[in-house]
Amino acid sequence: MFEERIVLDSAEFNLRHLTDSADDRQRIATFSAGKNALGLERYLKDCSVGHELAGENRTYLVLDAITDELACYFTLRSGLIPVPENSGQGYLSTLSGMELAYFALNENYRRRKTKTTNTRIGFYVFDKFILPIAKHVSRIIGARILFVYALPHPKLMSYYANTLGFRTLPRELEKFLYDRVKPDSDEGCVFMFQPL
C-alpha cells in the first residue's frame, strides 16, 4: 500500500497546491518572472487555474515559510514520449514520463532573498519538492523520466544539465521527437530529461 499524500514542507519553504487558498490570488497577481520569462508569468496569471480545473496538470506554489511570500511556482503533468524501435520497420514505442511544464522564480523575491542567504532557490525547490513529487508519482503510476522543454539559451540549458541533472538527446532523436509531439508553445525549445 502507498501513502496517498506526501508532506514536503521544509524549514525554508511551504508547498501549496494552486487552488488550496483564495489568498493566493493576491500572491499570484504580484508575481514577476522577470523580463526574459514573461511567458512563464503570463501562464501563472492567466492560464494555470483553467488548466488546473480542466485536469491538464498540477501547479504548485512555493511560499517562504517565514514571510509567506510566493517564492516560485512549478507545474507538472504526465506525458508519453514516442521512441523509435530498433526493428527497422518504423514501429514506435513510448516512454512514460512527467513533464516539468513550467518552473519560474518570483524575481522580486529572488532579488531580496539572495542578498540575505546563500540558498539557491531553484535548485532547492527542484531537489526538495519537484523531484520527490515526480518520484512519488512514478512509484504509483510508473513514470520513467522527468522531462522539460528548455528554452535554447546556453545559460539556462547549462543550468538544467549541470545543476539539475537533465540530459539532451542526440540531434536525430530530438528531431524525431519534435516531429511527433513537441507542443507549438514549446517551438524552438530543447527536450531534456532525467531518469526517475
Q: What are these model-derived regions, one by one?
A:
Residues 149-153:
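Short loop/turn motifs enriched for small/polar and acidic residues
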